[in-house]
Protein backbone atom coordinates (compact mmCIF):
# COMPACT_ATOMS: atom_id res chain seq x y z
CA UNK A 1 0.00 0.00 0.00
CA UNK A 2 2.80 2.48 0.83
CA UNK A 3 4.45 1.93 -2.56
CA UNK A 4 1.18 2.74 -4.31
CA UNK A 5 0.86 5.93 -2.26
CA UNK A 6 4.39 7.02 -3.21
CA UNK A 7 3.71 6.35 -6.90
CA UNK A 8 0.48 8.35 -6.83
CA UNK A 9 2.10 11.21 -4.89
CA UNK A 10 5.06 11.39 -7.30
CA UNK A 11 2.75 11.31 -10.31
CA UNK A 12 0.73 14.20 -8.89
CA UNK A 13 3.49 16.36 -7.38
CA UNK A 14 6.80 15.12 -8.82
CA UNK A 15 6.99 17.35 -11.89
CA UNK A 16 6.46 20.92 -13.02
CA UNK A 17 2.99 22.17 -13.83
CA UNK A 18 2.36 24.30 -16.89
CA UNK A 19 -1.19 25.62 -17.19
CA UNK A 20 -2.92 24.37 -20.37
CA UNK A 21 -3.44 27.20 -22.85
CA UNK A 22 -7.23 26.83 -22.81
CA UNK A 23 -7.25 27.65 -19.07
CA UNK A 24 -5.09 30.79 -19.35
CA UNK A 25 -6.33 34.37 -19.46
CA UNK A 26 -4.42 37.51 -20.37
CA UNK A 27 -4.60 40.89 -18.62
CA UNK A 28 -5.56 42.40 -21.98
CA UNK A 29 -8.81 40.39 -21.82
CA UNK A 30 -10.05 42.76 -19.08
CA UNK A 31 -10.70 46.53 -19.00
CA UNK A 32 -9.30 48.57 -16.10
CA UNK A 33 -6.97 45.81 -14.95
CA UNK A 34 -3.30 46.63 -14.43
CA UNK A 35 -0.58 44.10 -13.63
CA UNK A 36 2.77 44.86 -11.98
CA UNK A 37 5.40 42.11 -11.55
CA UNK A 38 6.47 41.42 -7.95
CA UNK A 39 8.95 38.54 -7.71
CA UNK A 40 9.86 37.03 -4.34
CA UNK A 41 11.81 34.05 -3.00
CA UNK A 42 10.47 31.03 -1.16
CA UNK A 43 12.07 28.55 1.25
CA UNK A 44 14.75 27.04 -1.02
CA UNK A 45 15.68 30.41 -2.53
CA UNK A 46 13.52 29.62 -5.58
CA UNK A 47 12.15 32.72 -7.30
CA UNK A 48 8.36 32.88 -7.43
CA UNK A 49 6.54 35.01 -9.99
CA UNK A 50 4.12 37.30 -8.21
CA UNK A 51 1.92 40.06 -9.60
CA UNK A 52 0.05 42.99 -8.13
CA UNK A 53 -3.30 43.61 -9.82
CA UNK A 54 -5.11 46.91 -9.51
CA UNK A 55 -7.93 48.94 -10.99
CA UNK A 56 -6.35 52.30 -11.95
CA UNK A 57 -9.60 54.06 -10.98
CA UNK A 58 -9.33 52.91 -7.34
CA UNK A 59 -7.34 55.44 -5.30
CA UNK A 60 -7.84 53.96 -1.81
CA UNK A 61 -8.20 50.15 -1.93
CA UNK A 62 -10.33 48.33 0.64
CA UNK A 63 -7.52 45.86 1.28
CA UNK A 64 -5.22 43.40 -0.42
CA UNK A 65 -6.36 39.89 -1.35
CA UNK A 66 -3.69 37.23 -1.82
CA UNK A 67 -4.75 34.56 -4.32
CA UNK A 68 -3.43 30.99 -3.92
CA UNK A 69 -4.05 28.90 -7.04
CA UNK A 70 -5.12 25.29 -7.26
CA UNK A 71 -3.41 22.18 -8.56
CA UNK A 72 -3.15 22.03 -12.34
CA UNK A 73 -3.26 25.76 -13.03
CA UNK A 74 -1.25 28.87 -12.26
CA UNK A 75 -2.54 32.21 -11.04
CA UNK A 76 -3.61 33.48 -14.47
CA UNK A 77 -6.45 30.95 -14.55
CA UNK A 78 -8.02 33.10 -11.82
CA UNK A 79 -7.92 36.40 -13.73
CA UNK A 80 -11.76 36.58 -13.94
CA UNK A 81 -11.92 36.37 -10.12
CA UNK A 82 -8.98 38.78 -9.78
CA UNK A 83 -10.73 41.20 -12.13
CA UNK A 84 -13.90 41.03 -10.04
CA UNK A 85 -11.93 41.75 -6.87
CA UNK A 86 -10.11 44.74 -8.36
CA UNK A 87 -13.31 46.19 -9.81
CA UNK A 88 -14.79 46.06 -6.32
CA UNK A 89 -12.04 48.13 -4.76
CA UNK A 90 -9.38 45.60 -3.77
CA UNK A 91 -5.74 45.25 -4.70
CA UNK A 92 -4.81 41.65 -5.51
CA UNK A 93 -1.48 39.88 -5.06
CA UNK A 94 -1.35 36.62 -7.02
CA UNK A 95 1.57 34.30 -7.70
CA UNK A 96 2.60 31.03 -9.29
CA UNK A 97 3.70 28.52 -6.66
CA UNK A 98 6.95 26.54 -6.76
CA UNK A 99 7.22 24.50 -9.97
CA UNK A 100 4.22 26.23 -11.57
CA UNK A 101 4.20 28.27 -14.78
CA UNK A 102 6.53 31.27 -14.40
CA UNK A 103 8.03 30.31 -11.02
CA UNK A 104 11.21 28.34 -10.46
CA UNK A 105 11.28 24.76 -9.23
CA UNK A 106 11.71 21.32 -10.80
CA UNK A 107 8.40 20.16 -9.33
CA UNK A 108 5.46 21.45 -7.33
CA UNK A 109 6.83 19.33 -4.44
CA UNK A 110 3.50 18.69 -2.65
CA UNK A 111 0.78 20.11 -0.43
CA UNK A 112 3.17 21.39 2.25
CA UNK A 113 4.96 23.50 -0.39
CA UNK A 114 1.70 25.30 -1.21
CA UNK A 115 1.47 26.41 2.43
CA UNK A 116 5.15 27.41 2.53
CA UNK A 117 4.84 29.47 -0.67
CA UNK A 118 1.72 31.22 0.64
CA UNK A 119 3.52 31.99 3.91
CA UNK A 120 6.33 33.65 1.92
CA UNK A 121 3.77 35.53 -0.21
CA UNK A 122 2.05 36.85 2.93
CA UNK A 123 5.38 37.97 4.37
CA UNK A 124 6.24 39.67 1.07
CA UNK A 125 2.96 41.62 1.19
CA UNK A 126 3.49 42.51 4.86
CA UNK A 127 7.00 43.82 4.09
CA UNK A 128 6.04 45.83 0.98
CA UNK A 129 5.19 49.43 1.87
CA UNK A 130 2.62 49.76 -0.94
CA UNK A 131 0.35 47.55 1.19
CA UNK A 132 0.95 49.39 4.50
CA UNK A 133 -2.22 49.79 6.52
CA UNK A 134 -4.31 47.57 4.24
CA UNK A 135 -6.10 44.58 5.72
CA UNK A 136 -4.81 41.30 4.26
CA UNK A 137 -7.29 38.71 3.03
CA UNK A 138 -6.75 35.30 1.43
CA UNK A 139 -8.52 33.56 -1.45
CA UNK A 140 -7.62 29.96 -2.26
CA UNK A 141 -9.03 27.30 -4.55
CA UNK A 142 -8.40 23.53 -4.33
CA UNK A 143 -4.74 23.14 -3.27
CA UNK A 144 -4.75 26.89 -2.63
CA UNK A 145 -7.86 26.42 -0.49
CA UNK A 146 -5.93 23.96 1.63
CA UNK A 147 -3.05 26.45 1.87
CA UNK A 148 -5.17 29.45 2.96
CA UNK A 149 -6.63 27.46 5.85
CA UNK A 150 -3.37 25.79 6.92
CA UNK A 151 -1.33 29.03 6.87
CA UNK A 152 -3.65 30.68 9.39
CA UNK A 153 -1.72 28.95 12.18
CA UNK A 154 1.18 31.29 11.36
CA UNK A 155 -0.70 34.50 10.51
CA UNK A 156 -3.32 35.35 13.12
CA UNK A 157 -3.68 38.88 11.71
CA UNK A 158 -5.37 37.81 8.46
CA UNK A 159 -8.66 39.72 8.18
CA UNK A 160 -10.72 37.28 6.08
CA UNK A 161 -10.41 34.04 4.13
CA UNK A 162 -12.29 32.58 1.18
CA UNK A 163 -11.57 28.87 0.87
CA UNK A 164 -13.11 27.51 -2.34
CA UNK A 165 -13.27 23.74 -2.87
CA UNK A 166 -10.30 23.14 -0.63
CA UNK A 167 -9.40 19.90 1.00
CA UNK A 168 -7.84 19.35 4.40
Where are each of the predicted segments found?
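An N-terminal hydrophobic leader/cap segment in hydrolases
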Residues: 1-41, 51
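Short beta-strand-to-loop junctions in surface cap/lid or active-site-entrance loops
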Residues: 50-60
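Short beta-strand element of the alpha/beta-hydrolase
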Residues: 61-70
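Alpha/beta-hydrolase
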Residues: 68, 95-97, 164
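The serine-hydrolase catalytic nucleophile loop
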Residues: 71-84
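Conserved alpha/beta-hydrolase
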Residues: 82-104
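Alpha/beta-hydrolase active-site loop
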Residues: 108-129
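Primarily recognizes the serine-hydrolase "nucleophile elbow" in alpha/beta-hydrolase
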Residues: 124-128, 134-168
